[in-house]
Amino acid sequence: MADIKGKYSPRLANKRGAARLAAVQALYQMDIVGSGVMETAAEYEAYHLEKNIDGNQYLDADFQWFLAIITGVVKDQKQLDPMLHQQLSAEWSLSRLDSILRAILRAGLWELINRQDVPIAVVMNEYVDIAKAFFEGDEPKLVNAVLDSMAKKIRL
């Protein structure tokens, strides 16, 4: 599992925020290990969500929200990736991005498209906070810029 460099923002200490973080980690795991959605979901439900592992207490997460994100991203990835590719420069092409950053962008874009009931600001803030937990450089700014641009196109 990818290392989290920063501390959790207070916004991540809610069930949906915890589900988003877990979904990003699961998408990263699926990308790196090549595991399937149901296998990964079962592993997270059994071993990660709401568990104390090696002294680390995992946050109480909304499992249905987590499952919706990971299944949705995998199902819609062929539509999501070209949309993300259009937003990125040659220096930040999708294939060159860190796997965890790709997972963050895919999950955030999927949620913007498919969860119209969630305010844009909530989606953007949550995924920028997740990016800040993993990265100390320009990556959170990239997440903010890409999701902001996509939100303007998707939710006019």
From Swiss-Prot:
It comes from the Bacteria. The keyword Transcription regulation applies. The keyword Transmembrane does not apply. GO terms for cellular component: cytosol. Disulfide bonds: none annotated. Gene3D superfamilies: NusB-like. SUPFAM superfamilies: NusB-like. GO terms for molecular function: RNA binding. Keywords: RNA-binding, Transcription, Transcription antitermination, Transcription regulation. Pfam families: NusB. GO terms for biological process: DNA-templated transcription termination; transcription antitermination. NCBIfam families: nusB. Involved in transcription antitermination. Required for transcription of ribosomal RNA (rRNA) genes. Binds specifically to the boxA antiterminator sequence of the ribosomal RNA (rrn) operons. Belongs to the NusB family. HAMAP family: NusB (MF_00073). This is Transcription antitermination protein NusB. The gene is nusB.
